[in-house]
From Swiss-Prot:
SUPFAM superfamilies: Anticodon-binding domain of a subclass of class I aminoacyl-tRNA synthetases, Nucleotidylyl transferase. ATP binds at K273. Belongs to the class-I aminoacyl-tRNA synthetase family. One of its GO terms (molecular function) is zinc ion binding. This is Cysteine--tRNA ligase. GO terms for biological process: cysteinyl-tRNA aminoacylation. The lineage of its organism: Bacteria, Pseudomonadati, Pseudomonadota, Alphaproteobacteria, Rickettsiales. It comes from Anaplasma phagocytophilum (strain HZ).
Length: 462
């Protein structure tokens, strides 16, 4: 398996720290609003990676955090008059419902920032004691100048940090690029339940220390893969990396850094509230677009490439999914899904996913399977191929198992083959009356037959 590693700017063979247990961390939602399709794309990307790793390794621990305290949450909660716990609970529930609709597996662990304050305080204390952080006016700042490797992940130099995203100029800072680890609580913070005691006074954590603490708590000082959107590379991931490398001498933090590309709408337009073009998963679902279609649109573009969301992409996804489902509809659910985990995944699909999660190539393999199913005349061979399609689509999360027909609609394949053989013999012997009777008998059983030009008779359920 190969993954593109942002840190080394190259596709690398995946070599986990411990092949018996692969560990992955992905940045999750900040729960102050409904999940939009940019959030959803990232979730689907790392869900596919989680599924693939589970296919290849005996154990996988996937941690995806929930940021349930930050400036946006506090401001939004203040507008409603709720404390941050009550306010975020609703959006966490909505997020989980959306993820279920997209068929994203639950992560192994889903920590909330507000439940991990003690670990954050522990890390901040280590950074202060080691000289990588300093206290000014009740705030604690990380000193980027203290970390000689700062900027290597995003390819930036310390002198350029002042122009970086989310970097504010503050007279308290020793360097404009220094970032806050702990900030003093305001009256509003206290009122909304967004303040905790610390050695530096009442306050709340900075954004970056939250992920450092949660990854450390559940995955240790070093782990295999850190994932997130390309927009998080700087400053968030750069700062996470600096914090953990400085808190734990000798730690590499994450062995591989994986970033999914940006998402635009309607021919390259950036989503923003000011433009009024933010598309939420819930909004799409309420308009009748099923989660499988949303997921399929994401998978049609390689995760590292920009993705443009538009009506044509939705239509194409709906059409493609319909073709897959139709290729399996003659079989019962039991035929398609019984002991499905024992069915091998399509080799071309698996190899595509192992090559830096090449989902477009994997989808092409699925449609090649659909073509084989549709041109195969033998029922048992079609069923065999359909089960491979079902298993392979399940690996990608496109389905949890194609539905097929109910058990009551099952047919006796051996009986059908016997009747088809009798009909062939009747036709060859010129007994067309008997051949027609057998055709009618098959029709009464719900079986439609078609005689091809080459003399092969195909059958399917009506």
């Amino acid at each position: 398996m190969k993954l593109y590693d942002t840190f080394s700017a190259a596709k690398r063979v995946f070599d986990p720290i411990d092949s018996a247990c692969v560990k992955i961390y992905a940045c999750g939602p900040t729960v102050y609003d409904l999940a939009h399709i940019g959030n959803a794309r990232s979730a689907v990307v790392y869900d596919v990676l989680f599924r693939l790793l589970r296919e290849l390794y005996p154990e996988v621990i996937y941690v995806r955090n929930i940021t349930d305290v930050d400036d946006k949450i506090i401001n939004a909660a203040a507008e409603t008059g709720q404390n941050i716990g009550d306010f975020t609970e609703r959006y966490i529930r909505y997020f989980h419902e959306d993820m279920d609709a997209l068929n994203c597996l639950s992560p192994t662990v889903e920590p909330r920032a507000t439940a991990e304050i003690d670990t954050m305080l522990q890390l901040i204390s280590r950074l202060v004691e080691s000289g990588h952080a300093y206290v000014k006016g009740g705030s604690v700042y990380f000193s980027i100048s203290s970390h000689r490797h700062y900027g290597r992940l995003s390819g930036r130099k310390i002198d350029e940090m002042i122009s970086g995203n989310r970097v504010s100029i503050d007279a308290e800072k020793l360097h404009p690029g220094d970032f806050v680890l702990w900030k003093p609580a305001t009256e509003q913070d206290i009122k909304l339940g967004a303040a905790w005691e610390s050695p530096w006074g009442g306050g709340r954590p900075g954004w970056h220390i939250e992920c450092s603490a949660m990854s450390y708590r559940y995955l240790g000082e070093s782990f295999d893969i850190h994932g997130g959107g390309a927009d998080l590379m700087f400053p968030h991931h750069e700062n996470e990396l600096a914090q953990n490398m400085c808190a734990f001498s000798g730690s590499e933090y994450a062995r591989y850094w994986v970033h999914n590309g940006f998402l635009t709408v309607n021919a390259g337009e950036k989503m923003s509230k000011s433009l009024g073009n933010v598309i939420t998963v819930r909004g799409l679902r309420n308009s009748g677009i099923e989660g499988a279609v949303i997921r399929y649109v994401f998978l049609c573009t390689h995760y590292r490439k920009p993705l443009d969301w538009n009506e044509k992409a939705i239509f194409d996804a709906q059409s493609a999914l319909s073709k897959m489902r139709r290729s399996c509809e003659e079989f019962t659910s039991e035929e398609l899904n019984s002991d499905i985990e024992a069915v091998g995944v399509h080799n071309m699909l698996l190899e595509a996913l192992k090559d830096d999660m090449n989902t477009p190539m994997a989808i092409a393999a699925l449609h090649a399977l659909v073509g084989e199913i549709n041109k195969t005349t033998d029922f048992k061979e079609r069923l065999k191929l359909a089960r491979v399609l079902n298993r392979s689509a399940k690996l990608m999360g496109i389905t949890d198992g194609f539905a097929g027909k109910s058990a009551e609609e099952a047919v006796d394949v051996d009986k059908i083959q016997e009747l088809l053989e009798r009909r062939r013999e009747a036709r060859n012997g010129g007994n067309y009356s008997l051949a027609d009777e057998i055709r009618d008998q098959l029709h009464s059983m719900g079986i439609v037959i078609k005689d091809d030009k080459d003399g092969v008779t195909r059958w399917s359920r009506a």
